[in-house]
Amino acid sequence: ILLVISFFILLEFNFKSLVLGLLSVPFVILYPFMKRITFFPQLFLGIIFSWGVLIVSMQFNTRITFDFLLLYFVCIFWTLAYDTIYAYQDRSDDVLNKIKSTAVYFDKNGKRFVQTCYLIILIILSYFVWNSSNFLLSSIIIATIAICTYIAIQKWDITSPLSSNYYFRQNNIFAIMLFLLLQTF
C-alpha cells in the first residue's frame, strides 16, 4: 500500500524525479533480504531511506547538486548510526538465528562504529555551517548536536537492550536539532 501511495505522490514530480524515484523500487524490494546477505543491511537501508534527498534535488534543481549529495551522505550515515543502535537490542537473537547486521559484525566495537558515523555526519554538516549565512547560530546548534551525541554514545550500554532502545529513540532529539540546523542555511 505504501509503495502505491508513494507512486501516486511521485507522479506529481517532474520526469527526471519520477525516473529517479522508480529506480529505487528494486532496492526497496531487495531490502528485506539484506540481513541474510550482508552484515551491512543498515547501509542498504540508509541508501533507500535517504533516496528522497536525491529526488528533491532533482525536482528543484533538475540535477543532483553537490550540497544535496552531501545531505544524502549525512542521511545515510545517520541511518547507519541509529539503526546500528537499534540492532543491538536483538543482537543475541540475530547471532543465534544467523541474521547479519552491523551489531553482529562490530560486536563489542559497535560504539566506535556509531561514533565514527556521527563524526562523519558532523564533519559534513560543518561544511554547511562554514558556508551558512547565519554562522553563529548554526555553530551553536552543531556544537549542541556534537555534545549531546557524544554524551548519549558514552552512556549507551551496547549489552543492554533497554539502553539500546532508549538511545535509539533519542535520535528524535538528533532529528529535531538537525532540522533546526538545516533552517539556518
Tell me the role of every PLM-derived stretch:
Residues 1, 83-107, 154-162:
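Cytosolic, membrane-interface loops and tails of multi-pass inner-membrane proteins
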Residues 1-21, 77, 96-136, 140:
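Multi-pass membrane catalytic core of lipid/isoprenoid biosynthesis enzymes
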Residues 28-32, 74-82, 86, 144-151:
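Alpha-helical transmembrane segments of multi-pass membrane proteins
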Residues 3-4, 25-28, 49-50, 75, ...:
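Residue-level recognition of pore/gate-forming positions within transmembrane alpha-helices
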Residues 41, 90, 171:
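Residue-level signal for inorganic ion chemistry
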Residues 1-70, 127, 150-157, 162:
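Intramembrane alpha-helical segments
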